[in-house]
């Protein structure tokens, strides 16, 4: 039987469904005694060879799916951190790698160290395709990619827009604007 006719038979299902497999050559180098001994020692694989090769029976009722580390069906965990120095930032990155949400309250840090900490954790968040959000003054939320962050705050949309150009209106607009963080106050 040629290769093309075998392929046609496989596609059509003729020879294999009828049990016409006699023209295939098998090697019977191993004696029958050794086959029985290997089946007795082979465990689950020995029971498969006894019957229909496509019937796995009850031996493989379990699943072969292996879960991802860090993902569980338990409740999600949020870490609230109030670091006092930059040396505590690797803990935030480790929590993100373990698929935990991190809230950083940086009010206890010096402004330059706080900026460095935000940049460091934001880089780690970007590396794992996570999300970052500024929650408040010196408070930031960093979430892994498995967490969806939505912002339903309408504070930004409700800020009035000043149309006039007189100096008094500009001063009122600057006073009403959100204050900049202490670490970002640099003269341009």
Swiss-Prot record:
Q: List the residue ranges forming a coiled coil, or say none.
A: none
Name the major location.
cytoplasm
Sequence segments annotated as region (Disordered): 152-188
UniProt biased composition (Polar residues):
152-162
Q: Which domain of life is it from?
A: Bacteria
* One Pfam family matching this protein: SepF
Q: Name one GO cellular component term.
A: cytoplasm
Where is the protein situated, by its record's location annotation?
Cytoplasm
GO BP of this protein: division septum assembly; FtsZ-dependent cytokinesis
Provide the alphabetized UniProt keywords. Cell cycle, Cell division, Cytoplasm, Septation
Kindly give the PANTHER family that the UniProt entry links to this protein.
Answer: CELL DIVISION PROTEIN SEPF
Quaternary structure? Answer: Homodimer. Interacts with FtsZ.
Q: What does this protein do?
A: Cell division protein that is part of the divisome complex and is recruited early to the Z-ring. Probably stimulates Z-ring formation, perhaps through the cross-linking of FtsZ protofilaments. Its function overlaps with FtsA.
UniProt family annotation: Belongs to the SepF family.
* UniProt-recorded name of the protein: Cell division protein SepF
The coding gene here is sepF
């Amino acid at each position: 039987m040629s290769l093309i006719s075998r392929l046609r038979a496989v596609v059509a299902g003729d020879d294999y469904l009828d049990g016409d497999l006699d023209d295939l050559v098998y090697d019977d180098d191993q004696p029958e005694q050794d086959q029985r001994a290997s089946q007795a020692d082979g465990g689950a694989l020995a029971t498969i060879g006894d019957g229909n090769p496509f019937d796995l029976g009850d031996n493989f009722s379990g699943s072969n799916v292996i879960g991802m580390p860090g993902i569980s069906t338990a409740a999600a965990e949020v870490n609230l951190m109030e670091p006092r120095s930059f040396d505590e930032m690797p803990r935030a990155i480790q929590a993100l790698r373990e698929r935990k949400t991190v809230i950083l309250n940086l009010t206890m840090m010096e402004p330059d160290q706080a900026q460095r900490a935000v940049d460091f954790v934001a880089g780690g968040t970007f590396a794992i395709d996570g999300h970052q959000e500024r929650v408040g003054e010196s408070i930031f939320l960093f979430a892994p990619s498995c967490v969806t962050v939505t912002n339903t705050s309408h504070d930004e949309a409700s800020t009035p827009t000043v149309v006039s150009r007189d100096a008094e209106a500009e001063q009122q607009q600057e006073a009403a604007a959100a204050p900049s963080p202490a670490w970002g106050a640099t003269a341009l």
